[in-house]
């Protein structure tokens, strides 16, 4: 484990030892917008419910639990922190778990069908390297949620993220960047880039939620995403690998 990863582990351990799970008493608006992201991503991926899924940087594994709620039956969570991982497994008995560093995943190639990560790549020293590791470990697809490199993203978001003295640069993504990384990794273009951007701002949505409720906020969000999604502040990267073609042994 490198020095940066060790510092991240220490920070995550301390956070969950001090605060415990973040999502147990989540306000309804936060629950809606947080769960919408992972539900929409998995819906667009359209993977079989029997898929073997790995969730990296799981923290207390709220997103993994949502994936289980959607009907997926083989979900493994991982984190660099034993404190976070132990908490995740106690909160949801449907999950399996293991300690993994998302920046250097100690697994063979194609170990899982789908690899998922939410808000974790920008904590790595090499976010692009983290995406490449996901591509290596995933047999069929990767999904990650991170800030979007857009005007709204830069205006609404932060350049630097500071947590208990630990500083991270908030690395931002675009569909073109994801495409280029995948080109470089695969050395071909036989993959699908289903990445998309969307509008997501907790404070703004909380204000509207007080007047609109869940149904009204859902309609507002759908409208914003339809008209302004490409300019949105949040991003979902999705790469689907090509289905391997069985080579005819008689063909050289």
Indicate where each model-derived feature is located.
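A short, conserved alpha-helix within the catalytic core of class I
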Residues: 124-133
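Short alpha-helix
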Residues: 170-189
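A conserved beta-strand element that flanks and buttresses the S-adenosyl-L-methionine
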Residues: 116
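Conserved beta-strand signature within the Rossmann-like core of class I S-adenosyl-L-methionine
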Residues: 139-147
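Conserved class I S-adenosyl-L-methionine
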Residues: 1-46
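Short, glycine-/aromatic-enriched active-site segment of Class I SAM-dependent methyltransferases
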Residues: 147-168
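Class I SAM-dependent methyltransferase SAM/SAH-binding core
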Residues: 55, 60-104
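A C-terminal cap/extension of S-adenosyl-L-methionine-dependent methyltransferases
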Residues: 192-252
């Amino acid at each position: 484990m490198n020095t940066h990863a060790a510092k991240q582990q220490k920070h995550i351990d301390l956070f969950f030892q001090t605060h415990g799970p973040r999502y147990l008493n989540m306000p309804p608006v936060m629950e809606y917008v947080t769960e919408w992201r992972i539900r929409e991503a998995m819906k667009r991926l359209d993977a079989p419910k029997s898929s073997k899924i790995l969730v990296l940087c799981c923290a207390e594994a709220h997103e993994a639990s949502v994936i289980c709620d959607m009907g997926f039956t083989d979900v493994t969570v991982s984190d660099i922190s034993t404190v976070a991982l132990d908490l995740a497994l106690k909160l949801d008995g449907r999950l399996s778990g293991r300690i993994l560093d998302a920046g250097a995943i100690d697994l063979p190639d194609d170990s899982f069908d789908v690899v998922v990560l939410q808000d974790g790549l920008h904590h790595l020293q090499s976010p692009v390297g983290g995406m490449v590791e996901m591509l290596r470990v995933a047999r069929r697809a990767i999904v990650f949620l991170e800030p979007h490199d857009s005007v709204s993203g830069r205006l609404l978001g932060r350049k630097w993220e500071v947590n208990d003295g630990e500083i991270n640069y908030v690395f931002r993504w675009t569909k073109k960047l994801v495409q280029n990384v995948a080109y470089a990794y695969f050395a071909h273009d036989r993959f699908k880039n289903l990445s998309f951007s969307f509008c997501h701002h907790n404070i703004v949505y909380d204000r509207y939620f007080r007047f609109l409720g869940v149904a009204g906020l859902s309609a507002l969000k759908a409208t914003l995403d339809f008209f302004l999604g490409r300019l949105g502040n949040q991003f979902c990267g999705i790469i689907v690998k090509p289905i391997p073609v069985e080579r005819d042994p008689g063909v050289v």
